[in-house]
Amino acid sequence: MARYCGPKNRIARRFGANIFGRSRNPLLKKPHPPGQHGMQRKKKSDYGLQLEEKQKLKACYGMILEKQLVKAFKEVINKQGSVTKMFLERFECRLDNMVYRMGFAKTIFAAQQLVSHGHVLVNGKKVDRRSFFLRPGMQVSLKEKSRKLQSVQESLENRDEGSLPSYISVDKGNFKGELLVSPEQDQIEAQLPLPVDVSVVCEFLSHRT
């Protein structure tokens, strides 16, 4: 499965936030956006703002691909309910993101690797598809051998219990977590490393799908 392999520090500097949770904050050394004219801020057009919000959303979930963004929007556009909430939920409830939220990985990229390398179980069965969509009641756990990984143990030890979303439960001792309920939009937005106007992203995609 394709994944982003580009410079992550440049992305963080572009949005002015350590969005990938790196231990060495790239903004401490270079707080301004990348590029020759990084310190100059130009006024963006409406189209430019839409593009920026879209890129911010993609970055928040580990640089998801454009086609994944479009696919998620198509899946919810004709459903009853809040399109922005259902659209955002498509990314929040991805398996790789749930592994990250539950504290089994320090970063979203580490979570992606855990899933892709076959370390993760869903309801007791191996799932190596990062975009697998979790529904309420589904349990996420790690294989017996995978629980001994130093990166996993360190991540769980350093996990702040207070930062665990209310729609997730985690049993550290058994390396297991569960999605309790479908998260509300404001709950999801509270977990994002930087603010994203999801309605603007949906408006952008509505003209291109």
UniProtKB/Swiss-Prot annotation:
Residue spans crossing the bilayer: none
Domain S4 RNA-binding: 93-156
Entry annotated with the keyword Ribosomal protein: yes
Keyword Methyltransferase: no
Region ranges (Disordered): 23-46
Keywords, in A-Z order: Ribonucleoprotein, Ribosomal protein, RNA-binding, rRNA-binding
GO BP of this protein: ribosomal small subunit biogenesis; translation
SMART domains: Ribosomal_S4, S4
Pfam families for this protein: Ribosomal_S4 (PF00163), S4 (PF01479)
Cellular component, GO, one term: small ribosomal subunit
Molecular function per GO: rRNA binding; structural constituent of ribosome
Matches recorded under NCBIfam families: PRK05327.1 (NF003717), rpsD_bact (TIGR01017)
Assembly notes: Part of the 30S ribosomal subunit. Contacts protein S5. The interaction surface between S4 and S5 is involved in control of translational fidelity.
Known function: One of the primary rRNA binding proteins, it binds directly to 16S rRNA where it nucleates assembly of the body of the 30S subunit. With S5 and S12 plays an important role in translational accuracy.
Family to which the UniProt record says this protein belongs: Belongs to the universal ribosomal protein uS4 family.
PANTHER family found in the cross-reference section: 30S 40S RIBOSOMAL PROTEIN, SMALL RIBOSOMAL SUBUNIT PROTEIN US4M
Descriptive protein name: Small ribosomal subunit protein uS4
